[in-house]
Amino acid sequence: MLDNGFSFPVRVYYEDTDAGGVVYHARYLHFFERARTEYLRTLNFTQQTLLEEQQLAFVVKTLAIDYCVAAKLDDLLMVETEVSEVKGATILFEQRLMRNTLMLSKATVKVACVDLGKMKPVAFPKEVKAAFHHLK
């Protein structure tokens, strides 16, 4: 666990790779998404509960990703996730995919809170915002 973030292990499976055993570029997004979801779970929130009880969903608003070094079949990796900014309806995540101390990829992901009934951005629930502010 990072000081103000979360670490999540991922193993590279055959389904994640191309014919050469290298992780397909879109799979990195899956790894980052899983880590953000599990991070939320450690704060005692689930996307399913927010969806069912409040009709809220977290959606990716913007994403920037850098691929530095290829991940390969059977690698055991760590996704490090930190919150760098919390605003009314958005949270900015900084994420790194690591193999030991080597950074393979990094991503900056802005996630927005959306009211699914209106399909418009809304402020994060107070308890979610407070949980993330506590980490900063």
Swiss-Prot record:
Gene Ontology MF term list: fatty acyl-CoA hydrolase activity
Keyword Disulfide bond tagged: no
PROSITE patterns cross-referenced by the UniProt entry: 4HBCOA_THIOESTERASE
EC nos: 3.1.2.-
The entry's keywords: Hydrolase
SUPFAM superfamilies: Thioesterase/thiol ester dehydrase-isomerase
Keyword Phosphoprotein: no
Enzyme class: hydrolase
Residues spanning the signal sequence: none
Sequence similarity: Belongs to the 4-hydroxybenzoyl-CoA thioesterase family.
Summary of the function given for this chain in its UniProt record: Displays acyl-CoA thioesterase activity with short chain aliphatic acyl-CoA thioesters, such as propionyl-CoA and butyryl-CoA. Enzyme activity is relatively low, suggesting that the acyl-CoA thioesters used in the assays are not the physiological substrates. Has no detectable activity with 4-hydroxybenzoyl-CoA, lauroyl-CoA (C12:0), arachidoyl-CoA (C20:0) and arachidonoyl-CoA (C20:4).
NCBIfam families recorded: thio_ybgC (TIGR02799), YbgC/FadM family acyl-CoA thioesterase (TIGR00051)
Protein name: Acyl-CoA thioesterase YbgC
The organism of origin for this protein: Haemophilus influenzae (strain ATCC 51907 / DSM 11121 / KW20 / Rd)
